[in-house]
């Protein structure tokens, strides 16, 4: 028997198909308010609800209970449903996106805040032409070089007596710690990059560097190939910086006596400065004549320049390295196969490409910029496809595979949630699913059994790196919901990663500092930069959280204090990271900024 029209009306679905698909609240009108705002009134359709409805009487009123929903039959009050006995932990595994309040204008917030940026004139494009003369050390100021290295800089009164910097190096040095006989030879500086077989510089042959070292006794001469001299200069600079940083850290851990005699400068420091300037003058030649040596050298330069230039300049330097890679067709599968056949170091060159690509994706997205090149534009063989797998390098290959997935995910998140102007599709659920899958892979990799000492300590660095990159992806994913107050997942992740970084770097456990000093190698800048960046963004998120929660405004969050503690310690290794501490302690309005896209992008959370 047919039901009455009233019964049919009661059985209509509570939400239209548009709101139901988006998993958002619906006011039940036809068309509903949300479809009117989205200019899709024709798509506002209500399906028949085939679920069994149960009539209940409470407080003299008849109400219908549709499973988990409690709807008043005459007024707008929501009745408490005490008949549900569901497992609270089941909510953890729900795949739904955080629901927006129907009062929020989805055209402004929605699931992407590209509209927010566009209204404020935010530019997500990358100016890929980078002027190398804009480096912090463009004036070849040796005082600045000493400070960025964390070396003991002579006073200005001693400056005229102790050294006289020139455009290409130093002259007139009065005193140096090492004599010419006792100072590390150039071959020793090369060896530093290859002393750990588990973590030597990929793509570069030590024997090739020995040949260049004997071929170019004077790097300032105009004869020879620019790319070869550039590669040798960057290797020698990085070797000098690594040994000198070890000396500085080990000395500071022993006593407070002066490391150098008065008016003296370490020859390692002066050599590093000399090699840096020699490499810098050759960069324009690299960009106009791309070669494998030039590409490898520029990737190394991007490594040690981490401690000398701003984050934005680091981004553009990595883009220049990628430009060389694209010019060499390192993003092309066919050309890479030819490289593997013709070059014995081809595998390492491809690994260098993936490393600099991952780094550039991370730097681009945290600056609110589109990546220079996406994975869809790359057919380069993955590390797992070209590297021989054994027990020793399985961990390293798996690390690279997950790192590439995280870089890809960060790029997807930024493009779909921040750049795309499409408002008809909600990609958040798929992105969140990808994020959870990568997180699971990281968790499994952390359980990889390791019983060799060197591999164990190496894995600690790699796993923390993955945790930091995962946290950064999470911050990008949940940032719009933090702004609208619809989810605190970013806050949860911020607290978690701060604890993880603190446990590995805090000086409250002496073994942490001992491990960092004893195992400091040529790549010491990258992991510390990643940790510092993650701590900085975490603190900004916690500051936003305090703004939202009124009763927390006058208190200091425990994790915030831990993060500042670690940042203060890391500044002792990378003094340039003091900029990140200043961003946290002295936040300024984005309208007062002078083009620092990192501060502008994350500072918008606080205003």
From Swiss-Prot:
Does the keyword Metal-binding belong to this entry?
Answer: yes
User: Where is this chain's protein located in or outside the cell?
Assistant: Nucleus
Q: Enumerate the PROSITE patterns for this protein.
A: ZN2_CY6_FUNGAL_1, ZN2_CY6_FUNGAL_2
Example of a GO biological process term: DNA-templated transcription
The residue ranges marked as DNA-binding region are 16-44
Q: Name one GO cellular component term.
A: nucleus
One MF annotation (Gene Ontology) recorded for this entry: sequence-specific DNA binding
Q: Which UniProt keyword terms apply here?
A: DNA-binding, Metal-binding, Nucleus, Transcription, Transcription regulation, Zinc
- Report whether Nucleus shows up as a keyword of the record: yes
Disulfides per UniProt: none
Please name the Gene3D superfamilies in this protein's record: Zn(2)-C6 fungal-type DNA-binding domain
- Pfam families membership: Fungal_trans, Zn_clus
Q: Which PANTHER family match?
A: REGULATORY PROTEIN GAL4
Protein name in UniProt: Uncharacterized transcriptional regulatory protein YNR063W
The uppermost taxa in this organism's lineage are:
Eukaryota, Fungi, Dikarya, Ascomycota, Saccharomycotina
């Amino acid at each position: 028997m047919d039901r009455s029209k009233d019964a049919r009306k009661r059985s209509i679905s509570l939400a239209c198909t548009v709101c139901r698909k988006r998993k958002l609240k619906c006011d039940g009108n036809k068309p509903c308010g949300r479809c009117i705002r989205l200019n899709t009134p024709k798509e506002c359709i209500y399906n028949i609800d085939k679920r069994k409805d149960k009539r209940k009487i409470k407080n003299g009123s008849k109400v219908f209970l549709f499973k988990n929903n409690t709807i008043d039959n005459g007024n707008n009050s929501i009745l408490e449903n005490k008949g549900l006995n569901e497992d609270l932990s089941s909510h953890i595994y729900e795949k739904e996106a955080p629901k927006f309040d129907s009062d929020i204008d989805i055209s402004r917030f929605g699931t992407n805040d590209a509209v927010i940026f566009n209204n404020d004139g935010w530019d997500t494009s990358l100016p890929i032409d980078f002027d190398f003369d804009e480096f912090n050390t463009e004036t070849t100021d040796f005082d600045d070089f000493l400070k960025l290295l964390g070396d003991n800089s002579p006073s200005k009164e001693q400056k005229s007596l102790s050294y006289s910097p020139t455009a290409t190096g130093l002259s007139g040095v009065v005193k140096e710690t090492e004599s010419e006989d006792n100072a590390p030879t150039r071959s020793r500086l090369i060896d530093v990059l290859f002393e750990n077989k588990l973590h030597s510089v990929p793509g570069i042959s030590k024997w090739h560097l020995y040949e260049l070292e004997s071929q170019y006794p004077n790097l300032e001469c105009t004869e020879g190939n620019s790319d070869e001299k550039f590669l040798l200069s960057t290797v020698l600079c990085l070797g000098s910086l690594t040994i000198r940083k070890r000396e500085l850290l080990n000395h500071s851990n022993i006593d407070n006596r002066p490391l150098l005699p008065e008016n003296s400068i370490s020859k390692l420091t002066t050599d590093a400065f000399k090699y840096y300037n020699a490499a810098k003058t050759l960069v324009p030649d690299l960009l106009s004549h791309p070669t494998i040596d030039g590409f490898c050298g520029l990737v190394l330069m991007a490594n040690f320049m981490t401690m000398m230039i701003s984050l934005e300049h680091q981004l553009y330097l990595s883009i220049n390295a990628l430009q060389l890679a694209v010019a060499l067709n390192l993003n092309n599968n066919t050309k890479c196969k030819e490289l593997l056949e013709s070059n014995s170091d081809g595998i390492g060159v491809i690994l260098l490409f993936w490393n600099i690509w991952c780094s550039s994706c991370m730097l681009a997205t945290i600056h609110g910029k589109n990546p220079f090149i996406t994975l869809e534009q790359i057919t380069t063989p993955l590390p797992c496809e070209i590297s021989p797998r054994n027990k020793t390098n399985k961990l390293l290959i798996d690390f690279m595979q997950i790192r590439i997935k995280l870089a890809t995910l960060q790029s997807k998140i930024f493009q779909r949630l921040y750049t795309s102007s499409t408002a008809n599709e909600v990609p958040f659920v798929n992105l969140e699913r990808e994020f959870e899958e990568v997180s699971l892979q990281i968790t499994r990799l952390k359980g990889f059994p390791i019983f060799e000492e060197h591999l164990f300590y190496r894995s600690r660095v790699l796993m923390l790196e993955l945790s930091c990159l995962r946290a950064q992806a999470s911050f990008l994913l949940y940032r719009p919901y933090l702004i609208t107050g619809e989810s605190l997942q970013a806050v949860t992740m911020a607290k978690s990663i701060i604890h993880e970084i603190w446990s590995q770097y805090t000086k409250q456990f002496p073994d942490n500092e001992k491990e960092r000093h004893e195992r400091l190698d040529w790549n010491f800048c990258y992991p510390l930069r990643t940790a510092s960046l993650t701590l900085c963004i975490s603190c900004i998120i916690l500051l936003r959280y305090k703004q939202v929660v009124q009763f927390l405004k006058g208190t200091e969050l425990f994790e915030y204090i831990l993060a500042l503690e670690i940042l203060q310690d890391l500044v002792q290794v990378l003094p340039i990271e003091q900029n990140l501490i200043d961003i946290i302690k002295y936040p300024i309005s984005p309208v007062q900024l002078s083009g620092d896209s990192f501060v502008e992008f994350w500072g918008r959370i606080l205003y």
